[in-house]
Amino acid sequence: MELHGEEQPPPPQEPWGRLLRLGAEEDEPQILLWKREWTIGRRRGCDLSFPSNKLVSGDHCKLTVDEISGEVTLEDTSTNGTVINKLQVVKKQTYPLQSGDIIYLVYRKNEPEHNVAYLYESLSGKQSLTQDSLEANKENMFHVTKDCSGPGQGDDPQVPLLSPMAQTCLEEPQPSTSTSDLLPTASTSSTEPELTSAGQKHSSSSGPGNTSISPKGRSSLVANGELSSLSPVFQDKEASFSLLESKDHEELEPAKKKMKGDGELDTNLQLLVSGQRGNAQTSSEDVKDASVKPDKMEETLTCIICQDLLHDCVSLQPCMHTFCAACYSGWMERSSLCPTCRCPVERICKNHILNNLVEAYLIQHPDKSRSEEDVRSMDARNKITQDMLQPKVRRSFSDEEGSSEDLLELSDVDSESSDISQPYIVCRQCPEYRRQAVQSLPCPVPESELGATLALGGEAPSTSASLPTAAPDYMCPLQGSHAICTCCFQPMPDRRAEREQDPRVAPQQCAVCLQPFCHLYWGCTRTGCFGCLAPFCELNLGDKCLDGVLNNNNYESDILKNYLATRGLTWKSVLTESLLALQRGVFMLSDYRITGNTVLCYCCGLRSFRELTYQYRQNIPASELPVTVTSRPDCYWGRNCRTQVKAHHAMKFNHICEQTRFKN
């Protein structure tokens, strides 16, 4: 933290306010506000600078005082907003500050150690602060909050009396000024004296251990910048206020104050120690029970941007982090990355499960619901449209690398509407399909050309090397069974059961994954398809099948490609030689059923080709490889190394070997 405003001597006018850092040491100096505008941020030119804290924006906020009325406002200029009293999130807006407000530049509910908070006090009251009252306030703010767990300490806490001026200030409603983050110890207690109009108080003795002035008690001492003289008073009376103990070392929630009809401040709290309630007198509007244990469900359902329960939440893909739709709408205008992990966002989707959980949670905890005004504001700030939630989805034919990975854009909405409009599937060999096609043709054409024309359906011709010229002479029965090609998503007659009886029927599925493909039946028409189904020995894997072919190790794969290029060999040569070695029993595949004649799809064929290529590279004599390749030591983890995808590690060690360390 740097104070650039103090580098120059301040003007002769009196300071109009000051900032006290929460959790500060006793001797840490206060920050006096004497300029009309006081800027706070990470930028070094700010009056209060945090150059090393990346959670603070460059220009986070600024405090401005009206010289005529004395009103102080906070204007937020940050990215994530400024939190006031843990209740009000100010984002790109101005907020009227009152004495006793706590300004959170960084507020992490689940990581309080990262919080950066300051207590604002006004010094523009009728009576200025004396040095004695200042020291007394610092004593209350910092000293008594420390853990007094030593024996004999804290038996008789000193509770200060308030002057009539300070009590008059307390009669006006003030924002919550909880400073529970000031309690650094694992076991603390929060106490609050009950004040009367005559300035009377009750003291408490919590035994030899934890004693501290309550957060609200401390904030009341600095309301409107006026402090009363402190006088220690000891009483033998039993405690009339409660202690809040937390075994989980979680943050304590401040108890709510209520005003009586005659102006007295009713701060009756309920005793929660050992399940007993205090004997304090309560009115008809009793304060609700404070939770002893933290609500894990609430923490799970909290948006990290607004630090409140999720509202109309959306999830980002692929990272699946969830935020309020309104909160993320403001974020996505500035960045296309996830606010949590900075992963590029590919898609936005509604998270119906979390929305239902939030709704069920609010039924059990209606007090934690957002206000109607807040809900209307969030709905108005929601810029996520239905088009963003249902974009064109890029569906890939395979998860493997290769030239057949050209993508096809399909819409979820289109597929749903087509299912509704068609009572059953009609393929090119259905009688209904042929009848419609003949009616749409201007002149008769041969049936073979008709089948080829309709097969294209307006798409570019298939790049398959073995595209059948005509569909088999077959007609589907009425409402017959159909299979959808995994490559082109077009229907075809499901004749797989018939093939078991008649081998002349063309194969329609992969022998390994059992997924249906139409290439061998009548030729796949998808653009870029090199033959999605074929016998292993005839499978067209494409020229890019050698990229990362050796366990995604690009360095080892480049060594193999250079070896083949110098000898005029291609991937087809590798496949042919490997299948011969497989037939002789020299090479092995993890799936023993696969031979050169096994009908495979592109994915399964590429996977088996990679297994054979590794064994092909393993059997290359060292004398035929460069010295820079053979001189590398073997990696301990061999072919199973997970770091071999990194270029530096792959160049340094040989990974065409078996694992020798930590092998079970």
From Swiss-Prot:
Its EC number is 2.3.2.27. It catalyses: S-ubiquitinyl-[E2 ubiquitin-conjugating enzyme]-L-cysteine + [acceptor protein]-L-lysine = [E2 ubiquitin-conjugating enzyme]-L-cysteine + N(6)-ubiquitinyl-[acceptor protein]-L-lysine. Residues 174-202 have a biased composition (Polar residues). Belongs to the CHFR family. Coiled coil: none annotated. It comes from the Eukaryota. Keywords: ADP-ribosylation, Cell cycle, Cell division, Metal-binding, Mitosis, Nucleus, Phosphoprotein, Transferase, Ubl conjugation, Ubl conjugation pathway, Zinc, Zinc-finger. Interacts with HDAC1 and HDAC2. Interacts with PML (with sumoylated form of PML). The PBZ-type zinc finger (also named CYR) mediates non-covalent poly(ADP-ribose)-binding. Poly(ADP-ribose)-binding is dependent on the presence of zinc and is required for its function in antephase checkpoint. The FHA domain plays a key role in the anti-proliferative properties of the protein and is involved in initiating a cell cycle arrest at G2/M. The FHA domain may be required to interact with phosphorylated proteins. Disruption phenotype: Mice are viable and have no obvious developmental defects. They are however cancer-prone and develop spontaneous tumors. They also display increased skin tumor incidence after treatment with dimethylbenz(a)anthracene. E3 ubiquitin-protein ligase that functions in the antephase checkpoint by actively delaying passage into mitosis in response to microtubule poisons. Acts in early prophase before chromosome condensation, when the centrosome move apart from each other along the periphery of the nucleus. Probably involved in signaling the presence of mitotic stress caused by microtubule poisons by mediating the 'Lys-48'-linked ubiquitination of target proteins, leading to their degradation by the proteasome. Promotes the ubiquitination and subsequent degradation of AURKA and PLK1. Residues 245-263 have a biased composition (Basic and acidic residues). Residues 38-89 form the FHA domain. It comes from Mus musculus. Pathway: Protein modification; protein ubiquitination. Residues 399-413 have a biased composition (Acidic residues). Poly-ADP-ribosylated. In addition to binding non covalently poly(ADP-ribose) via its PBZ-type zinc finger, the protein is also covalently poly-ADP-ribosylated by PARP1. Autoubiquitinated; may regulate its cellular level. Residues 203-215 have a biased composition (Low complexity). This is E3 ubiquitin-protein ligase CHFR. It is found in: Nucleus, PML body. One of its GO terms (cellular component) is PML body. A zinc finger (RING-type) spans 303-342. A zinc finger (PBZ-type) spans 633-655. Residues 170-220, 245-264, 389-413 are annotated as: Disordered. It holds the Pfam family FHA. One of its GO terms (molecular function) is zinc ion binding. It is an enzyme of class 2 (transferase).
